[in-house]
Amino acid sequence: MAIIHPKVRGFICTTTHPKGCELNVRDQIEATRKLGVREDGPKKVLVIGASSGYGLAARITAAFGFKADTLGVFFEKPGTETKAGTAGWYNAAAFDKFAKAEGLYSKSINGDAFSDEARAKVIELIKNEMGGKVDLVIYSLASPVRKLPQTGEVIRSALKPIGQPYKSTAIDTNKDTIIEASIEPATEQEIADTVTVMGGQDWQLWIDALAGANVLAEGARTVAFSYIGSDITWPIYWHGALGQAKQDLDETALRLNQKLAGEVKGGANVAVLKSVVTQASSAIPVMPLYLSMVFKIMQEKGVHEGTQDQLDRMYRDRMYRTDGAPAEVDEKGRLRLDDWELRDDVQNACKALWPQVTTENLFELTDYAGYKKQFLNLFGFERADVNYDEDVATDVKFDCVEL
């Protein structure tokens, strides 16, 4: 038990609130339920990177939008009697509790999702507990490091531009001030390493392992999440080291699509999602300012979406359409859920606003207040229905295999 308040260092909140995290998950489940439960669609779903952000949302839509049995893989820190664990641990625990209350199969694996050990455990559970096959594999890993399964070598990714230094207006989120951010370009080695960590190699290893073990159902699909963003963030993102990794993901999708079409009449796609506040996006320089602006503009235009809205739309309007039509894709075979964010009217408003923002008018011209609230929400804070001066149980256990 502990009384827990937020402590923010840099772009990380170092504390989490178990009750707040549980209520966040409950709200996401309710949002999905409101759209109705479908009988068709995916029934046995594996989510790699299932404890927060888009991966968690993908698991929630599968379970509570389509009554699917789900297996989630993630790397989180459990809480103890005296100390809170990571937000993802409590998110996964809450998901498990609500899924089981619904009579759905739910199991989780806590360990390194990049490891062969995790793949072996997943295959074992699919064979022994999930009827032998899965029909959807969601790949949603966002990690700054990857330990290579063959050699044990640890590779790190770099959030850097390519070619020349990147200078831009940004928010110092600790001081709530507008600053000039400058980032030196990535070296060739850093670019290669970023592709190794954030590209399609591990996704390919997962699908190869699952296909090799014959645990992919007829018609099985796989989707990996990506972000392209607008040209405002391109120097640091799409045209930076991370963009190279995401292009590798695109190429992997084309290979996997051919493989699955041939082997199980299935398919593979990259899904390009909109920018949202996640632990991953808050680490990217310039993103907090861009998010604060784009949220305000999209809210004004009535097209703002959170993580859960995006995933519900991906399943319902793209992948599993009631009219049975194939998903609409772009010229590279990608599912585009960033379509509303990239509308000309939205982006032009962002570009017009960008040079006007100063420390003095930051809260007035943008939804930075909303950004800050959503950031703290990720860790279970800033909820009106939680008394943060009360003791809360931190040692939460659930149906999770520890690797």
Curated annotation (Swiss-Prot):
Keywords: Fatty acid biosynthesis, Fatty acid metabolism, Lipid biosynthesis, Lipid metabolism, NAD, Oxidoreductase. Substrate binds at Y227. The record marks E76 as: Plays an important role in discriminating NADH against NADPH. InterPro entries: Eno_Rdtase_FAD-bd_dom, Enoyl-CoA_Rdtase_cat_dom, FabV-like_NADH_b, Trans-2-enoyl-CoA_reductase. The active site is at Y237. It is an enzyme of class 1 (oxidoreductase). NAD(+) binds at residues 49-54, 75-76, 112-113, 141-142, 246, 276-278. Pathway: Lipid metabolism; fatty acid biosynthesis. Its EC number is 1.3.1.9. GO terms for molecular function: enoyl-[acyl-carrier-protein] reductase (NADH) activity; NAD binding; trans-2-enoyl-CoA reductase (NADH) activity. GO terms for biological process: fatty acid biosynthetic process. It catalyses: a 2,3-saturated acyl-[ACP] + NAD(+) = a (2E)-enoyl-[ACP] + NADH + H(+). Involved in the final reduction of the elongation cycle of fatty acid synthesis (FAS II). Catalyzes the reduction of a carbon-carbon double bond in an enoyl moiety that is covalently linked to an acyl carrier protein (ACP). Monomer. Belongs to the TER reductase family. This is Enoyl-[acyl-carrier-protein] reductase [NADH].
